[in-house]
Amino acid sequence: MPDSRAAPQESLLDASLGTTQENVGTSSLTDGQTLSKEPLSHALKLSTPEKVKDAQLNPPEEALWTTRADGRVRLRIDPICSQTPRTVHQMFSTTLDKYGDLSAMGFKRQGTWEHISYTQYYLLARKAAKGFLKLGLERAHSVAILAFNSPEWFFSAVGAVFGGGIITGIYTTSSPEACQYIAYDCRANIIVVDTQKQLEKILKIWKHLPHLKAVVIYREAPPMRMPSVYTMEELMELGNEVPEEALDVIINAQKPNQCCALVYTSGTTGNPKGVMLSQDNITWTARYGSQAGDIQPAEIQQEVVVSYLPLSHIAAQIYDLWTGIQWGAQVCFAEPDALKGSLVNTLREVEPTSHMGVPRVWEKIMEQIQEVAAQSGFIWRKMLLWAMSVTLEQNLTCPSSDLKPFTTRLADYLVLAKVRQALGFAKCQKNFYGAAPMTAETQHFFLGLNIRLYAGYGLSETSGPHFMSSPYNYRLYSSGKVVPGCQVKLVNEDAEGIGEICLWGRTIFMGYLNMEDKTCEAIDAEGWLHTGDTGRLDADGFLYITGRLKELIITAGGENVPPVPIEEAVKTELPIIRNAMLIGDQRKFLSMLLTLKCTLDPDTFEPTDNLTEQAVEFCQRVGSKATTVSEVVGKKDEAVYQAIEEGIQRVNMNAAARPYHIQKWAILEKDFSISGGELGPTMKLKRLAVLEKYKDVIDSFYQEQKSKQGSSLPGFSLRWQTGASS
């Protein structure tokens, strides 16, 4: 190792550790493919029944929550959820026994797909764990990962847990300041990065991170030799210096009710909160939450999954990483530019059996299909519209019927099967979405392609899914049924049966790291998690989300107005609208901010000025020649504004009462985005940020207008221009 580096610190290891020699390749992944199986047979001793019994619950006096990284909690074992708790290592050991020779991960190297088996995956995780220990990983401290999805992300995460640490993901889009907050809060001993860009962020803030001992970089080489900065290959070499027995001692001491993962919320209302997840949270949810979604074990059918959503978010982490281990799935990694356009190429090559996307991803796929259709020949376009029309009608009228009419089967054979194949969904049996609401328009579009989108509902605080839809539990617009073994209750229900959703079960998190007040707000005295979301349950137990308590608008007149149903109604009525945000808290009436559907820059994923094909078609239907946002907004296109006003009036006509009417609105010059601050990492609307950013526009809605002069479009009551009431 370079002499300029500080010597790695040892913490959980005895200072007199010996060394063992193993085969060392030229890269961390090649290394995993050539490792001897001798350490594996040694490690498997830990998965015997005697070791499983060792992982027992702690005494019953332990509380249901803690805010300490080294704390333990009482597991929520009861008659309906009595499964034996397991650690992550025990889960992986069972997988090795069943699926050791199966492909665990697929990744592209120089244009060619390569694979890592579960045996190789396990050995890589052990070597990473020993490397982390050699670098000074302390118990209940973190290994933070600031990188795009990759095999290194996976075996570093598992290795961190094996080594007694806590895995903490950081969004790759995070600023240095955001990285500093998380790395400091989680007491990161080691940070793993994939590029020089991410390394530079850490170098800027290192002096503010007293617990940080080393950085590991793997996709790109560091620009120069630097103290305490290692490549992944060097980390693995350091792991050779730690005996297998030393790692076994650490693994064997782990308990299911200890923290092994931290998931940081997006911080829409302040600093991000570190959601502490126990080993039992992870292993129970990976098994039973995925079963509720009909994920299959590899002995029945090996699931194939494309990993591309941020692993720092609980949805991707539980679905890609932990569920993959539980059932022996093959996880194939997309390119880092997946969300900039390459995802479909990966889907075509991999042909996944199940797939998950946030609503914006599904919307982007929908827009791409619409653009291709608009540029296709007349006959093909008409055939596609016919096929989607008859298929949508069938799926809406007989959603559970396996007996399809001849016309529906013909439409699928002639048209829709080809579309699904072009998307990479020829073999995909389960398509999931979560993390944000999905419009009825998007759901109908994919039903027209004979693609059901199965919703799940959960939070970081529920380790991911607490409700799941599946081919056997599906109802349009619902979030599915509660995962067997979990519980739900609605509190403070109104006359329509809508109340706050409260949850209980093995999915419920340990607590917020270092935030006792926030933890007590979330978990009541009886141990129920108060989600802050509102919803209703139908007679069959399907959950329908109606909004959030914190988002509930209380007008100056005392009317309680949930914004989401009104926003969704506007987007359904006006297909040119991408984002709609209702305003009116403590105001005399409701108003709304709108953005138009525009294309995204393929390199930056930023909104452009160009309208999508669907938006252009809308303009043409209403008599406008506009093709850009600036033509509509900058020139106040009369035809488009009139059409939007009429659409909003139609929404108002269907409102329950006049206080629910949208009285004023404005179209913003640019669509919402992550970089603009209006959207979170999963494209969820950050309402407080929008209120602050567009404060002047909003205030203009409620200023008393002294004169109506200056209106270029009489008859609009200046609703959309200056905020004057009609």
UniProtKB/Swiss-Prot annotation:
Gene3D superfamilies: N-terminal domain of ligase-like (3.40.50.12780). Keywords: ATP-binding, Cell membrane, Cytoplasm, Cytoplasmic vesicle, Endoplasmic reticulum, Fatty acid metabolism, Ligase, Lipid metabolism, Membrane, Microsome, Nucleotide-binding, Phosphoprotein. One of its GO terms (molecular function) is long-chain fatty acid-CoA ligase activity. The modification Phosphoserine is found at S36. Residues 17-36 have a biased composition (Polar residues). Residues 1-39, 707-726 are annotated as: Disordered. The modification Phosphotyrosine is found at Y641. It is found in: Cytoplasm; Cytoplasmic vesicle; Microsome; Endoplasmic reticulum. It comes from the Eukaryota. PROSITE patterns: AMP_BINDING. The keyword 4Fe-4S does not apply. PANTHER family: ACYL-COA SYNTHETASE BUBBLEGUM FAMILY MEMBER 1, LONG-CHAIN-FATTY-ACID--COA LIGASE. Catalyzes the conversion of fatty acids such as long-chain and very long-chain fatty acids to their active form acyl-CoAs for both synthesis of cellular lipids, and degradation via beta-oxidation. Can activate diverse saturated, monosaturated and polyunsaturated fatty acids. Belongs to the ATP-dependent AMP-binding enzyme family. Bubblegum subfamily. This is Long-chain-fatty-acid--CoA ligase ACSBG1. It comes from Bos taurus.
